[in-house]
Amino acid sequence: MARAVGIDLGTTNSCIATLEGGEPTVIVNAEGARTTPSVVAFSKSGEILVGEVAKRQAVTNVDRTISSVKRHMGSDWTVDIDGKKWTPQEISAQILMKLKRDAEAYLGEPVTDAVITCPAYFNDAQRQATKDAGKIAGLNVLRIINEPTAAALAYGLEKGKEDERILVFDLGGGTFDVSLLEIGKDDDGFSTIQVQATNGDNHLGGDDWDQKIIDWLVSEVKNKYGVDLSKDKIALQRLKEAAEQAKKELSSSTSTSISMQYLAMTPDGTPVHLDETLTRAHFEEMTSDLLGRCRTPFNNVLHDAGISVSDIDHVVLVGGSTRMPAVKELVKELTGGKEANQSVNPDEVVAVGAAVQSGVIKGDRKDVLLIDVTPLSLGIETKGGIMTKLIDRNTAIPTKRSEVFSTAEDNQPSVLIQVYQGEREFARDNKPLGTFELTGIAPAPRGVPQIEVTFDIDANGIVHVSAKDKGTGKEQSMTITGGSGLPKDEIDRMVKEAEAHEAEDKKRKEDAETRNQAEAFAYSTEKLVNDNKDKLSDDIVKEVTDKVNALKEALKGDDTEKVKTAQTELMTAAQKIGQVLYAQQGAEGAAAGADGAGASAGSASGSDDDTVEAEVVDDDDDKDNK
């Protein structure tokens, strides 16, 4: 049976885990690391690179390297590579395919089922895009679950039997969430994890802290050299890598040096060098506004849950950005001096929780119940542009809610159902999720027809909406996919393309291996001929040398089949060398044996006159004779 996995599809890094004997295990990737950079690159030859190898070549291939694509999920953003427009779903699918391949190599069996995490504050379009990315990657997405919920799931399983409230503070590379959860265990060890409230900011994360350093460095260079690096893509990529490294170093040191040579050239040809020292105090000062943006979601969660800071039992930090000392201090301040729990790895805990949830869904774990919530209110636009909410935020999911509406005009033949997600009073200020029309309403004065609108949110947090005219029984429904949603045929096309790319990559790898083997064989055969020229006939030397040259010529081209043919012909010719060398070796051995046998026979059959009589003398006799 195929294995199920849990995947944390992150902005900066991604992680994959599975259950081994009922316990979660993080899967090491092909490079030997426990997390994989969420970076995808397209080489000039058309090869798709993912992870560390893509990240390493970013400076020399800026326009064809994509990072932090998670920030574009649920939008209509695309990137043009060689005339093909790639969507965020397709780029994310490449990351998922890499994780899937590495997991299959690690486990030695197929991986088809996955629970994929997303930020708790992702809206419907972003969740649908995440699910689509999984489909394109060839995964059966069992569930989309919220990252803080997954983290609490991993953390909560280690706790005792007492009921506890856990606050999860999740600051990743590109998104920020705060969730409050209640965890309880009964006497049989059955855990119930219920989300009480969640809030966040989908455009706040470690990337923004990096950008502050980049902006500062650009400003320093401009002041010193008069050169604006903000238009230089290669210089910016180098600054980005330096900024990320500086941020990490300032988590453990009070200052760091940023030194970069030959970043650019001034108009008069002077090279631009960078040598700056950034202190932690200066870094915290320049990023104080970002830190301030973390306060509102925290306060909103406490307000929505109706609790005070003193009701929080534990604080769990998730996401690499929570390693920054200023973030830890902020959490401590907000929670009234509570020290955050250090028992979980902030980079891995989300994937671990997702793996546990995959086990729950597949029936491998029967000791956990997870109850999540919808992060944003859902409603429709009614007369006057009002946002009429049918499902309030922080409602436990799955859930279903219906409400009856009517027409605004006499004899109105149809109604346009416009679905929105958000907390603002007017529909236009919220996120539009989709629109559909219910037609065929029987003529009647306004206010008479009864139109029942039903919202159904599944366990993935994805919305299904239907509208029914109670008078005629006519019904219209849709699954919300948002403005960026992909129709099924488009997803199917992308799945086929992704499979084709995977097949292409596999063939490219096989071709490279074939060429390497052929090159090595040509070299070793040529050496064998040169080392044994004196033992080989001119005909064999010429035949093999010609075949070696033919193989070398084939290797200069791109036709792998031609290389294979040339290698096969060389192997056939090279066999003659072996036959000659072994034959000569056998002949020499036979000759040596014949010489030895002749000597023995001569001694035995000679005449008596030729026989030498001898006696053995001891040492004393020998001495006397001397």
From Swiss-Prot:
Task of the protein: Acts as a chaperone.
UniProt GO MF annotations: ATP binding; ATP-dependent protein folding chaperone; unfolded protein binding
KW Flavoprotein (keyword) present: no
Residues recorded with modification Phosphothreonine: T175
UniProt feature, compositional bias: Acidic residues: 607-626
Protein name: Chaperone protein DnaK
NCBIfam families reported for this sequence: PRK00290.1, prok_dnaK
Keywords linked to the UniProt accession: ATP-binding, Chaperone, Nucleotide-binding, Phosphoprotein, Stress response
Record-stated family: Belongs to the heat shock protein 70 family.
Region Disordered, annotated ranges: 586-626
Induction of its expression: By stress conditions e.g. heat shock.
